[in-house]
């Protein structure tokens, strides 16, 4: 429902390239529908995960500058209703009953960049240059880079 509502607000269809961008604030199952119905994907660089845990999605059209933030607002009490009842409520509600529509405060994210690959000097696997760290003069991937934490 989020993806269809966003497409309606942006007056667009499926995006085969990077014309539509989605910033999702959760990693729940609704993100799967966003990928299928909008064409946004992590691999193409036009689906960006910004973890706030909210059922909120910001959509941007690079083609014409339209944008919309869609936030799920319907209160669903899982203790009072079965899964089937909740599903029916979601499917039968209007977009306005389900969602708040506002304009995102942020600018659209930049287009995806391509980076050179660097060989990790510890494991021998390649990683993009922006994910390589220097440790004692050696280029290490994030998996081989020793954790450095001081508690904050």
Residue spans for each PLM region:
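A structural-propensity feature for long, helix-poor, extended segments
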Residues: 19-59, 63
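Cysteine-rich micro-motifs
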Residues: 134-147
